[in-house]
UniProtKB/Swiss-Prot annotation:
SUPFAM superfamilies: Globin-like. This fish has two hemoglobins: Hb1 and Hb2. They display the Bohr and root effects. Heme b binds at residue 89. The gene is hba1. Keywords: Acetylation, Heme, Iron, Metal-binding, Oxygen transport, Transport. It comes from Cottoperca gobio. PROSITE patterns: GLOBIN (PS01033). This is Hemoglobin subunit alpha-1. InterPro entries: Globin (IPR000971), Globin-like_sf (IPR009050), Globin/Proto (IPR012292), Hemoglobin_a-typ (IPR002338), Hemoglobin_oxygen_transport (IPR050056), Hemoglobin_pi (IPR002339). CDD domains: Hb-alpha-like. Red blood cells.
Length: 143
């Protein structure tokens, strides 16, 4: 699913509003993923504490949203813009790419809760398409 110029503008506008809370969004989204989809915990067995609000969850949530910030800045060419992250997740971390969609869904949920007035139906569809594009770009090196 390709992003239209209208989608890109909507994502940039929404990111402009939510980026100040990116760390909290990332931590909450990651916490939700680990709780709702417990099979995702297998990637974090080296963490002593996977509970919401733990230091490791907060730190990785911040890293995730740093990747989203990068994706927003590379929105016109997600595949090439996220190639390094794709290689890292494919070759070093060996994350099942299905998990990108799971985390994307959790990000949508958190943004909708934290920014209900800004999360209009139009913003929702544009952010969903964008996160799908990010997931696809991250899965590029798995092929």
């Amino acid at each position: 699913m390709s992003l239209t110029e209208k989608d890109k503008a909507a994502v940039r506008a929404l990111w402009g509003k939510i980026s100040k809370s990116a760390d909290a969004i990332g931590a909450d989204a990651l916490s939700r993923m680990l709780f709702v989809y417990p099979q995702t915990k297998t990637y974090f067995t080296h963490w002593p504490d996977l509970s919401p609000g733990s230091v490791h969850v907060k730190k990785h949530g911040k890293n995730v949203m740093g990747g989203i910030a990068l994706a927003v800045s590379k929105i016109d060419d997600l595949t090439n813009g996220l190639m390094e992250l794709s290689e890292q997740h494919a070759y070093q971390l060996r994350v099942d790419p299905a998990n990108f969609k799971i985390l994307s869904h959790c990000i949508l949920v958190v943004v909708s809760i934290m920014y209900p007035k800004d999360f209009t139906p139009e913003a929702h569809v544009s952010l969903d398409k964008f996160l799908s594009g990010v997931s696809l770009a991250l899965a590029e090196r798995y092929r």
